[in-house]
C-alpha cells in the first residue's frame, strides 16, 4: 500500500515535534543522577546497508546503555528502543550521562527493582539520508 507524499510529510512534521515528558509522573528517586554505581552511554557506529539504493554499504549510529559493572563475559537481556519516522538514534534522549533514560536505568538497577540489562537506541532508517531535506520519504516504507 502506497503512502501519499502529503501523508508522509505530515507524519514527519508530527514526529519532529518536541516530546514532553511529565517528569512528575516519574518518582524522584529514579530521576537522580547517581555518583556511584552508574552505567555508561556509548555512542557506536556500525556497518549497514541502504535498502533503497540496492544495498549500498553505509554506516549507521546507535547509543548503547551499559549497566554499572558491565562485563563482556556475562550475558544480558537487551532492550531495543526504536524511533519513529523522521527520528534517529538520539530520539529517546539517551545521548549522554545526563539522560533521563540513563538515570532511570541506573536507579532501577541500584534499588534492585530490575536486573541489569543493556539498552540500545539504533538508527533504524532504511536509507543513508532518509530524514534529510530533499530525500525520498517513500523509501522509509
For the regions a language model picked out, list residue spans one by one:
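Non-catalytic cap/lid and distal C-terminal segments of serine-dependent acyl enzymes
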Residues: 1-141
